[in-house]
């Protein structure tokens, strides 16, 4: 499953990671960047990732090229900054998703980093930091890592996560660029055939009424026996992936699996909180209400994908990157955030981000200044209309103007802290919730000891 996820990220990440779509400014102006560090001249910078290449010396520079005006202007800008400042820079696929953590760690330990800058998952970066393998980027004054940066938007959620004893070890530009936010995709045709407005989720979301009560009402309307033979022909959703389904309601109730103690910074098991138990109860209730298509006997693990893609179920709950999987669906579709539960006042973007890190070995402080300056310059937005690059990705503008606008808003962000705990699998709850013979609180209690042990171990690393 994780390999398939990585494949879709390959197709999408170049558009949003290091592409400047989360824009703040108008036309890029070299003067906004300030004077380039002297150490930049003659430097060759490789931004190592696990999905695809971007090389400005090639035409097209990447396999994900569509020739849009935005892409053309980005390419022109990136060629210009290299030419004017005497350096070279490229994004390079240096490893597979499975290989990247080891290649990053071993190459840095050996003093021969496989890349100048690594783009890695947050949990990988945390492991690298705890091994002393990351450069404290906050020691550099080449770019402003605060909200005062007027050239690019620095992700403050990531800054806070990777700041230890007043030093910061990882950063990201913009919000939502890793496409990991939990969302609900919905089939407009099935809404219409059930007598519902095909834009109903958008309308409810916009009006602040996209909540569990409305969601359940809609699910019941979407689950239909269309030919009166006693067998349901369409369902609101599938019973898989149960982990993604539970994520939706945990997020929607402003809860989480693992939280951070505001005073100590330690990770804390949050599955026993009232908000989490309430989310688990609601997920189980949906299954018992009969609005979820059960897994067919003998079906593959990913059976749920064609059920939505082929119009058998009306909604699919997953991370945002799945929009590539449904790009060629015959039916039109939309995308909204998780509906609000009783404990939530606002919509929540439950997400994590890939992060950018610089190795602790192999570069002088002057070179780090130059590298950071170049990364910022590479990511200067070429189009002040952040929507421009997104409209072609979706079937309607409301997904961009409304849902994506909320995904980009820092105040809606909630980081998936559970990914920072090695060996912790939320499936130990989600995989069991349809079949557990007992109360939701008892299911949580049955795994609490192992969860607490793993969280304690993570805090001691």
Protein language model annotation of sequence segments:
Residues 129-132, 138, 155-202, 239-264, ...:
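Periplasmic solute-binding protein
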Residues 2-14, 20-131, 366, 382-389, ...:
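Conserved N-terminal structural module of periplasmic/extracytoplasmic solute-binding proteins
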Residues 166, 327-393:
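Extracytoplasmic/periplasmic substrate-recognition and gating elements
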Residues 216-221, 249-252, 256-297:
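Glycine-centered hinge/linker elements that transmit conformational signals in sensory
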Residues 94-103, 208-214, 295-309:
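Short helix-initiation/N-cap motifs at beta->coil->alpha
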Residues 28-43, 49-50, 95-98, 122-181, ...:
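Hinge/lid segment of periplasmic solute-binding proteins
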Residues 138-153, 205-207, 235, 255-278, ...:
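Short, solvent-exposed loop/beta-turn-alpha elements that line the ligand-binding surface or hinge
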Residues 208, 225-234:
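Acidic, glycine-anchored loop motifs typical of Ca2+
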């Amino acid at each position: 499953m994780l390999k398939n996820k990585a494949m879709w990220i390959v197709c999408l990440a170049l558009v949003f990671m290091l592409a400047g779509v989360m824009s703040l400014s108008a036309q890029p102006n070299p003067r906004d960047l300030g004077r380039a560090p002297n150490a930049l001249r003659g430097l060759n910078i490789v931004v190592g990732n696990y999905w695809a290449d971007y090389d400005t010396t090639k035409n097209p520079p990447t396999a994900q090229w569509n020739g849009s005006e935005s892409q053309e202007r980005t390419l022109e800008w990136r060629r210009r900054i290299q030419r004017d400042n005497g350096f070279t820079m490229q994004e390079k696929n240096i490893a597979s998703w499975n290989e990247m953590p080891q290649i990053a760690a071993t190459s840095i330990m050996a003093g021969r980093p496989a890349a100048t800058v690594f783009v890695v998952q947050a949990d990988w970066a945390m492991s690298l930091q705890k091994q002393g393998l990351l450069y404290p980027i906050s020691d550099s004054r080449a770019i402003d890592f605060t909200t005062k940066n007027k050239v690019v938007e620095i992700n403050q959620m990531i800054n806070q996560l990777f700041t230890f004893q007043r030093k910061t070890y990882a950063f990201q530009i913009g919000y939502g660029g890793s496409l990991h936010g939990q969302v609900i995709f919905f089939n407009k045709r099935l809404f219409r055939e059930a007598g519902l407005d095909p834009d109903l989720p958008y309308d409810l979301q916009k009006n602040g009424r996209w909540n569990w009560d409305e969601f359940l009402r809609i699910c019941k309307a979407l689950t239909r026996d269309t030919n009166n033979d006693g067998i349901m022909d369409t369902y609101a959703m599938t019973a898989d992936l149960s982990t993604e389904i539970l994520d939706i309601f945990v997020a929607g109730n402003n809860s989480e699996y693992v939280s951070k103690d505001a005073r100590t910074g330690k990770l804390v098991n949050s599955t026993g909180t009232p908000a989490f138990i309430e989310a688990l109860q609601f997920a189980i209730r949906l299954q018992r209400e009969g609005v979820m298509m059960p897994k067919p006997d003998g079906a593959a693990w990913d059976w749920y994908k064609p059920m939505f893609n082929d119009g058998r179920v009306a909604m699919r709950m997953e991370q945002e990157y799945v929009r590539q999987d449904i790009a060629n669906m015959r039916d039109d579709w939309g995308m909204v955030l998780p509906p609000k539960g009783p404990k939530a006042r606002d919509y929540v973007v439950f997400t994590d981000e890939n992060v950018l890190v610089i190795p602790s070995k192999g570069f002088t402080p002057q070179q780090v200044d130059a590298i950071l300056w170049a990364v910022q310059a590479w990511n200067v937005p070429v189009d002040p209309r952040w929507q421009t690059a997104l409209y072609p990705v979706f079937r309607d503008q409301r997904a961009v103007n409304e849902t994506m606008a909320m995904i980009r808003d820092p105040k809606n962000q909630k980081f998936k802290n559970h990914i920072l705990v090695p060996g912790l699998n939320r499936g130990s709850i989600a995989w069991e919730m349809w079949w557990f013979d007992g109360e939701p609180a008892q299911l949580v209690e049955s795994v609490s000891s192992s969860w607490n042990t793993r969280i304690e171990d993570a805090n001691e690393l």
